Amino acid sequence: MYKRQLIYIRRPDKKNAGFFQLILFRIADSVITGMCVTIVTLPVILIISGQIPVISLFLNVIVIPLMSLIMISGIFTGIAGMLSLEAAYFFAGAGGYILDFYYKLCSLSSHFKYAVIVTGTPDTARVFLYFTVLIIWICVHVILMNKKIDAVCFALLVCVLTGLHYNIDSDMKIAMLDVGQGDSIVMHTKEGMNVLFDGGSTSKKNVGRYTIYTYLKYCGVRSLDYVFISHPDKDHVNGIYELIELCDNTFEIGTVVLPGIRRTTAVKKQAGDDMSKLERTLKATGINVVYADAGDSIKSGEFSVECMHPCKGYNYESANDYSAVYLVEYGDFSMLMTGDAEKKAEKCIVEDANRMAGDAGESARFMSVNILKVGHHGSKGASSEEFLSYVKPENALISCGAGNSYGHPHTETLQRLSGIGAKVYRTDESGEIAVRVRDGSYKIEAFKALKG
């Protein structure tokens, strides 16, 4: 038997064992070594990448036996390099070919459906518990050498491992990501629905890959059920293109919702090229696309999203004025997503909301929302007094880049928000802004401490 090893396995008698039997036990050695390495390093891998490389257990059968050749190649390369570069190149060749083989092997294996499982990043307490149980297991094994106790400890370790990425959360979570001069808001419902509102930036490069996608992996998000795009400006969609490119076996997008302006002349005049490019990209990837007009909605449990704008048949002079505006409700909680809508769109929203309420025999819509996502990054032309007095937000979230050249948010906009008593949170000052909603109450937290 292997002694003082985490897994018991009978060693063959080399004198009596056949060639194929020795090969099988060599493979078993590689698998066991790979499992031991994975068991020890898995929490670290989860913290760094938020995913489990399942395929690595199988790749180690090939990788580990060849590591000795790479070591030998490296040693001889170092020695030869002191004498002759040509000789060093010769000895480095063997190791280089093996490393190239590793790279191609990993690239090929990444296309398998369950090669990698996205789990999210575990919290510190659970990682500490995992390592505590692991150390206890090793100590018990080394001291007692008892299979039954080993089995109990291993079963406990598996339970803790499962708990590293399994979350039972009764909260709805909202995150306004710090994407610089742009917009991106992610919502997670307790029922497991994941929704993205816009995703772009003109001040951060590769914001889709390195900010939005990284955040989604951190949270263990493997799919976005809905992606709502307010309008096709770069600071709202360039990260979406990157997310589309990242769709593979570990990440997918269900439905993309676009503003219902495809039937208006504004498409040709204002954003025809941008909208057409976006539609072509989505069509090529097979992602489901729907168009939202005022009055359209989706609902899942307590969570609902209703389109308040664009109004049907309206002529738009500015691309920002046809930004899709959505009222998000979760129980008694409400949040208004305004994209880059400005005064003209705001007036249309108020008039249309009152008209729909009157037709239904109801009072005015979304009076006093809990949170307003301030339109157009807090520009002077957005958040008019009429609109704010109608919406009456308790809190206002502004997404803008630090020191941006547009002067966002504008002083007059901040004064108007202050005048109605709304507490303002800004990503240029606070970084990421998180909202937790539970049983009608909510709490807003900033990633960085607010000034003052």
Which residues does each PLM region occupy?
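Conserved small/polar residues in nucleotide/adenosyl-binding loops
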Residues: 1-5
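Non-globular, low-confidence helical/coil segments that flank catalytic cores
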Residues: 7-15, 22-24, 60, 79-452
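Globin-like tetrapyrrole-binding proteins
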Residues: 41
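Interfacial helix-loop-helix junctions of multi-pass membrane proteins
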Residues: 46-56, 385-387
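Non-cytosolic membrane-interface motifs at loop->transmembrane helix junctions
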Residues: 53-64, 89
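Hydrophobic/aromatic-rich transmembrane helices and adjacent perimembrane loops
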Residues: 63-66, 71, 98
